[in-house]
Every structure is written in structure tokens, then in C-alpha cells.
């Protein structure tokens, strides 16, 4: 018999409804979170090279936390803002 976590993490934390309040649409949220997750991932990749081109996580992280989870917590915390661009 499998075990079920009593406090599931991931997309349920932060709640999707709270995240949607921070953007204009669910599609904007996906793009916003994905771009920030790529930045966080690039930051971790460049640490060993001594380059500091990207901004690291703006929230406390755990060692195995995924960049997308970090990005969503940053968005939910109001630490990031989405700026509309004129580019397609």
C-alpha cells in the first residue's frame, strides 16, 4: 500500500488561485514562471564558474527545491513583477 503525503507540496503550494491574482491570465503566469525558473537554473549553473550574471533566488530555498517552485514562491510573495512587452 502506498503512502500519501499529508501536506502535499508542489503546485498546491502556493495555491494556484493566489498565483493567478498576480498576473493577467493563466498563460501569462506560465510564461512568467518559466522565464524566472530558467533564470534561477542559470544562476545555479554559473555559480561554479564564478560568473554572477543572473540574480539568485529571492526566497529561502531547500537543497532539492526545483527552480519552478522557487519562481512560483517568488511570484506569490510579490517579489517579482511582470512587465508587458511589445515583442511577440
UniProtKB/Swiss-Prot annotation:
<dbReference type="GO" id="GO:0006351">
    <property type="term" value="P:DNA-templated transcription"/>
</dbReference>
<keyword id="KW-0240">DNA-directed RNA polymerase</keyword>
<protein>
    <recommendedName>
        <fullName>DNA-directed RNA polymerase subunit omega</fullName>
        <ecNumber>2.7.7.6</ecNumber>
    </recommendedName>
</protein>
<dbReference type="GO" id="GO:0003899">
    <property type="term" value="F:DNA-directed RNA polymerase activity"/>
</dbReference>
<dbReference type="InterPro" id="IPR003716">
    <property type="entry name" value="DNA-dir_RNA_pol_omega"/>
</dbReference>
<dbReference type="GO" id="GO:0000428">
    <property type="term" value="C:DNA-directed RNA polymerase complex"/>
</dbReference>
<comment type="function">
    <text>Promotes RNA polymerase assembly. Latches the N- and C-terminal regions of the beta' subunit thereby facilitating its interaction with the beta and alpha subunits.</text>
</comment>
<keyword id="KW-0548">Nucleotidyltransferase</keyword>
<comment type="subunit">
    <text>The RNAP catalytic core consists of 2 alpha, 1 beta, 1 beta' and 1 omega subunit. When a sigma factor is associated with the core the holoenzyme is formed, which can initiate transcription.</text>
</comment>
<dbReference type="InterPro" id="IPR006110">
    <property type="entry name" value="Pol_omega/Rpo6/RPB6"/>
</dbReference>
<keyword id="KW-0804">Transcription</keyword>
<comment type="similarity">
    <text>Belongs to the RNA polymerase subunit omega family.</text>
</comment>
<dbReference type="InterPro" id="IPR036161">
    <property type="entry name" value="RPB6/omega-like_sf"/>
</dbReference>
<keyword id="KW-0808">Transferase</keyword>
<dbReference type="Pfam" id="PF01192">
    <property type="entry name" value="RNA_pol_Rpb6"/>
</dbReference>
<dbReference type="GO" id="GO:0003677">
    <property type="term" value="F:DNA binding"/>
</dbReference>
Amino acid at each position: 500500500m502506498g503512502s500519501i503525503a499529508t501536506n502535499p507540496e508542489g503546485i498546491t503550494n502556493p495555491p494556484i488561485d493566489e498565483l493567478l491574482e498576480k498576473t493577467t491570465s493563466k498563460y501569462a503566469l506560465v510564461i512568467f514562471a518559466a522565464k524566472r525558473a530558467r533564470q534561477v537554473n542559470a544562476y545555479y549553473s554559473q555559480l561554479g564558474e564564478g560568473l554572477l550574471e543572473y540574480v539568485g533566488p529571492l526566497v529561502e530555498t531547500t537543497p532539492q527545491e526545483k527552480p519552478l517552485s522557487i519562481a512560483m514562491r517568488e511570484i506569490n510573495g510579490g517579489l517579482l513583477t511582470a512587465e508587458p512587452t511589445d515583442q511577440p
